[in-house]
Amino acid sequence: MKKKLIGVFLFMSLICGSVSAQGLPDRKETLKTLVKVNDYFMKKYADYRTPSYNGIIRPSNIWTRGVYYEGLMALHSIFPREDYYNYAYQWADYHKWGMRNGNITRNADDQCCGQVYIDLYNMSSDPEKIRKIKACIDMIVNTPQVNDWTWVDAIQMGMPIYAKLGKLTGEQKYNDKMWDMYSYSRNVHGKNGLFNPKDGLWWRDADFVPPYKEPNGEDCYWSRGNGWAYAALVRVLEEIPADELHRADYINDFLAMSKALKKCQRK
C-alpha cells in the first residue's frame, strides 16, 4: 500500500474529483494535479486567518478548514515545500494550537485540527503544539462515554487523533478508546450501528438507518460521509502498530468498503 500517496490522494481527491475505476492514475500526473489544486487554494486564501463561509461564518480551525490542512501536511510529506509548512504552521499558531470550544469539547468537528497540530509537532517537538489537543483527548479517554461519533463524518474528524497520540506517546489507552468509540458508532449507534456490513457502506447518522428508505425503496448512503470513513481507516492504519489488537478489524472494514465503493464509482 503506497500509504503516503494514498493518504494524500484520498484527501485531496475530495477537491480534485473522482478517481478512475481502472486503477491508480500515474503518480507524476497525480502529484501535478495535487500541486496545481493546492496552489490555487493557497492563492485564493492567502490569509490563513480567513474564516470558513458556507452561509455561516465559522472559525478557520474547525473541520471545514482542518481537513484541508490534513491534506496539505500529507502533500508536504511526499513533496516538501517550505511554503506548505509555513502556511500550516502560521494557521496553527494563529489559533494558538487550540480548538473552537476549548479543551473540553467532545465535538469531533472541533478536534479535527488536532491531527495537523500533531503532524507539526512531529516535525518540531514543541510541547505547546499538542498540549491542548492532548488535554482534550485525555479528558475523553478518562470518561466512560463512547457515543461521541454520532454521524459518520466524525469518524474522520476525530479517530486519527487517537491513533496519532497512541503512536506518539506509546500509550495503549488511546488505541483502546479509539476502538471503543469506533465500534460503538459502527455496531450500536442508532440501535444496530451506522455500518451496513451487507453493503459495506455507512449510513450518515441515526436518521438514515433502517427502516428509513428513499422513495425508490433503497438505502440512503452519503458519498461524502463514506469518503470520510474510508479516509479515516487509511489514516489510522498508517499510525497503529502491526500487532494492534483491532488492526484486522479496521483492515476488514477498509476492504469491505473498497469493494463497495468500486461498485458505486462512475465510469
Question: For each predicted feature, which ranges?
Answer:
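Bacterial Sec-dependent N-terminal signal peptides
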Residues: 1-25
